[in-house]
Amino acid sequence: MSDLTRFTQYEHLDKVKKVVAIGGGHGLGRLMSALSFMKSRLTGIVTTTDNGGSTGRIRLNHGGIAWGDLRNCLNQIITEPSTASSLFEYRFTGQGELSGHNLGNLMLKALENMHIRPVEAIHLVRELLHVKSHIFPMSESPVHLAAVLQSGASIVGEVGIDNLTELPKSIFLVPLVKATPEAIEALQEADVILFGPGSFLTSILPPILLPEVIEALQKSHAKKIFIDNLALEQSPAASLSLSDRIQWIHHTVGKEIIDATIVPTNANDLCENLSLKVMVRPLQADDISYRHDRSLLSQAIDDLLGEL
């Protein structure tokens, strides 16, 4: 890790007992990495609806949950790279059936095939990689994301939804599965709950569609913060302003739950129509402009907690 987050003292985050981050993809992995200094006080609830890439091929041929985002989060919060972590992230090249597959995905799928609970499979890998933070799938049952289009037709599959040319009317889960019990327990015990950054429709929203998650969020007294993206999404969600996305969450949950949001300095929506705190900060990483700098992000969260 190139930043100094694990050596920095945080006035507010150091006092927080439990933080839960909800999402998927690279966004959640980046956030978990930024907060990895919190170790066992940090929990990620990860979207498991992916049907693209190596994960999609495994699901198509062998069924099961989507392991890719879980694997990515595990890999991003490793503070001490090792042969084991390199092996876990190894991706096959060349020709043939293994080409493009990630070894970590295959390892996790193998554990699933051995009838080991996904939560236990992740725990085994956490121990192998010396990861202290907790990571739970949104559900331990196979599930896909679906959408109702403006025409009234429906499509199933995260990849298809990301490739839509218009915003869907609504999204839903197929089938409507049960949430992972440990994820619900983490939400119930959380002092801070973070949403994003990441793809809004396909990474952030899926866990919030689970009835048990909705109930936990409705009852939670935790501070709830939405972290905005640094660049426009390459998906139908690009047509949604920050206010639109927060209101979509509120509509899904059935309650206005977001207390604050963190936005980059180039943000064009400061949510003036919503009753929440907005923190504007430079957040871009030096190497990749659309990725959050870990140190800047963790400091922004810490400062915002001091104002809530």
Swiss-Prot record:
One of its GO terms (molecular function) is LPPG:FO 2-phospho-L-lactate transferase activity. It is found in: Cytoplasm. GO terms for biological process: regulation of cell shape. Its main location: cytoplasm. Keywords: Cytoplasm. One of its GO terms (cellular component) is cytoplasm. Gene3D superfamilies: CofD-like domains. Belongs to the gluconeogenesis factor family. PANTHER family: GLUCONEOGENESIS FACTOR-RELATED, UNCHARACTERIZED PROTEIN YVCK-RELATED. Required for morphogenesis under gluconeogenic growth conditions. This is Putative gluconeogenesis factor. It comes from Pasteurella multocida (strain Pm70).
